[in-house]
Amino acid sequence: MRVDQTEYEEAEAYQQSLDLLRGCLSPAGFVASPVNVDNYARVWARDGVISGLAALASGDPALIAGMRQTLTTLALHQGPHGEIPSNVTVDGSEVSYGRLAGRVDALLWYVVGVCAYIRYSSDSGFKEFARVSVERVLFLAACWEYNNRGLVYTPISGNWADEYIQQGYVLSDQLLHRMALSSAGLVFNKTEWQEKATYLQQMLAVNYWPLASLSNDPLVYHPHAYRYQASEQGEIDHWLPAFSPGGYVIYFDGLAHALALLTGLGDDGQRQRAEAYVQALEQRIGSALLPAFWPVIEPGDPDWTMLQSNHLYGQIKNQPYTYHNGGLWPVLTGLHAVGLMRYGKRERARHLLAAINTANAQGSDGGQWEFSEFEHAQTHVPMGTKYLAWSAAAGVLANQAIWHGVPSWLL
């Protein structure tokens, strides 16, 4: 598969991506997709915010207005305890905070989006409108720590991987919490939020890359599991995705990897080791697109029965090499590329952008530019819902970071 692109090809893909984002605008903000299947034609917190971040990166006034409206829609439908909707119909008649479990990440993406928009626009009216909703979100997130020890606990089906089997102290959700606290502390001048973000960053660096030399560190959250992982399981090649009272899980998490880069988690050696793992995975898979999780769960594996049970619509989406079960996602790859640009890795980031653009340009029945949700990790055939706003957002965010730098309002 050809993955290099000329600047002309990058520019064409960028315009196609902007056009798709415009096509996902509604009176209520960005819908996940204009294709009305499985609730995709709704305003979703995580999809809408990521699309909105791309809007800010683009500088397009209509798209930026769409970001503001997305955040407004989410705020106006905030739940009684501070919950941010997972999704809302465009007319506001139906609001979901999650079906099988509530969505921890919806809260956190909302705060990240609110603060990015305010830092970009200096919109004082919106800042005052959003202030109370942000305070309620961060209070609720603290409640979801349960034991007041600093880490949010995510139930199964409680984040973007809603049909996967991830649960516990999930790294990607902790990183979003850190981003939310840091940016909200800056925007709303709350020293306690900034201090909590700093402490959380330190906790994450210790607890998600267990090292024998740190086994007695006071920041270790689960000493028995930590010591076992550090001493008995050998060296690891990437950030561990989650742990729970039952111990660590050790699969690769694409979103956690991307967010770890974006937030500057760890040291140079850890970043280089994790990137080496990702590049080796690319050679194995044959694509630079980042998988949601790896390795794949196969029928007969211990986790297969639980994976089969956790789905809502029709047949199981998480067949091997698809969806969250090893599927390759442009949106994760876009966040990965932005994270790489934080460290000036332009050549590698352009390689990822080419993979995103190539994936987005594919279509069925001879069509082009269908912006599919994900690709099959063996066949590289586009799969899932078409015309995904955040697949387009991936190309915009990566392109703008490569050619204009990582925006200060994001970090």
Spans of model-derived segments:
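Extended amphipathic alpha-helical segments enriched in small hydrophobics
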Residues: V170-L204, G327-G363
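Alpha-helical support elements that line or immediately flank enzyme active sites
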Residues: D47-H77, Y120, A256-D267, T333-A349, ...
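Hydrophobic core segments within long, regular secondary-structure runs in both alpha-
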Residues: A11-L18, R22, G52, I64-A75, ...
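Inter-helical turn/loop segments and adjacent helix faces that build the functional surface
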Residues: S58, Y117-F129, S183-E195, L265
